[in-house]
């Protein structure tokens, strides 16, 4: 059974590989790189769109193979700004915007509102699609966003987000600390037993053949 990650984001792939003991393949290794239209209105809907798209294409190409496709949709929400960027976090500065462009647009928005620091939270939805069903789990991380970028670790909005109980941004933290507290880490801790269950069921089914 192959575990395939439905993302082309190198930062996300690195995080998933750190958190998973199994080898995780980016979908581009099997299908080549292409864009997936994410037109859902929630993180969960977008994660499912990505996972289903990759799963269906893999099964068309290799119907005899067993796959577990994992997709995550995540973003940051700032209540004082009406919840933005939310599900538009990856394209807050426009379609095709870089992480840096999105980051500095949110920093500029905070400055325009004269917010030095304000509460915010990350959401991660992980969708799991296989022959044996579909599942979605969530994880959250609360803290504050600040009107400057600090640190060069992580990706996305990490350099402006300070998790609750810490005085450093995610961009200043080592990967091990970040993984232990991150929204994606929390969601993946719920996804892992589901993935293991699917692997066990697939193995049992193979043994009976």
Curated annotation (Swiss-Prot):
The keyword Translocase does not apply. SUPFAM superfamilies: ITPase-like (SSF52972). It comes from the Bacteria. The active site is at 73 (proton acceptor). Its cofactor is Mg(2+). Mg(2+) binds at residue 73. It catalyses: XTP + H2O = XMP + diphosphate + H(+); dITP + H2O = dIMP + diphosphate + H(+); ITP + H2O = IMP + diphosphate + H(+). InterPro entries: dITP/XTP_pyrophosphatase, ITPase-like_fam, RdgB/HAM1. Binds 1 Mg(2+) ion per subunit. GO terms for cellular component: cytosol. Substrate binds at residues 7-12, 74, 155-158, 178, 183-184. GO terms for molecular function: dITP diphosphatase activity; ITP diphosphatase activity; metal ion binding; nucleotide binding; ribonucleoside triphosphate phosphatase activity; XTP diphosphatase activity. GO terms for biological process: nucleotide metabolic process; purine nucleoside triphosphate catabolic process. Its EC number is 3.6.1.66. Transmembrane segments: none annotated. Keywords: Hydrolase, Magnesium, Metal-binding, Nucleotide metabolism, Nucleotide-binding. It holds the Pfam family Ham1p_like. Pyrophosphatase that catalyzes the hydrolysis of nucleoside triphosphates to their monophosphate derivatives, with a high preference for the non-canonical purine nucleotides XTP (xanthosine triphosphate), dITP (deoxyinosine triphosphate) and ITP. Seems to function as a house-cleaning enzyme that removes non-canonical purine nucleotides from the nucleotide pool, thus preventing their incorporation into DNA/RNA and avoiding chromosomal lesions. Belongs to the HAM1 NTPase family. Homodimer. This is dITP/XTP pyrophosphatase. The lineage of its organism: Bacteria, Pseudomonadati, Campylobacterota, Epsilonproteobacteria, Campylobacterales.
